[in-house]
């Protein structure tokens, strides 16, 4: 048996941090420097212990709503019919390709390990190469502790939105933490173009009317569904079902705010 350690539900954001970074903190050197860990390109995290590779399939049953070749796991009181109708609607924004103004912000509320910063940097570099003006923030939001990390990252995102009102999408890039009851780590994996690859899971929050205030959750859900349809359609097995739940994660700040779990704490960086 295994236990998936989902992040704890977030309540209303805490007070903003007293000191907000004024500039993007860039990694030094070439991205290739970060794609080969010191222990070797296929090395697992040094503290990983026993690793169990596992492919997480798309779901079926009353809790799952089909989304193209993918699916959405509904952990809310919203009906399946309501969700299915909502994700059929168009996106509430349009990305302006080749715009001189930033369209996307990639950031990390927690887990600013060198691996996840490298992953976020590849995401940003790939979008920029495709003509989508993207910024990457590497602020250490969970230092000195996890407590307050989302308040800190909220202040950072608000600063970017004030400086660059053209930003339509905010991607909070993380890795998941999945462990068995015995403490072994699971590595969510699939095969893409012949290479073992970390699976991806999108988390989209929902307003619960009290502690989780997300008036724009429907628009964010449409965006999550568009990602799921595209990714799973292009690369079958690449995604885990979208997790639609009462989570906050500062997703009230735009209509394109999502948390992206890229692999887990058992995956290696190449995956």
State what each model feature region is:
Residues 3-105:
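Non-catalytic propeptide/linker segments at domain boundaries
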Residues 99-101, 165-168, 195-199, 255:
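Extracytoplasmic
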Residues 102-114:
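Short glycine-rich His-centered loop
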Residues 111-112, 140-144, 175-180, 207-210, ...:
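Solvent-exposed loop/turn segments at secondary-structure junctions
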Residues 115-122, 126-189:
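Catalytic-core regions of hydrolytic enzymes
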Residues 178-213:
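A short, glycine/acidic-enriched catalytic loop
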Residues 216-243:
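Active-site-adjacent substrate-binding region
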Residues 240-271:
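Active-site-adjacent mobile loop/cap segments within catalytic or ligand-binding domains
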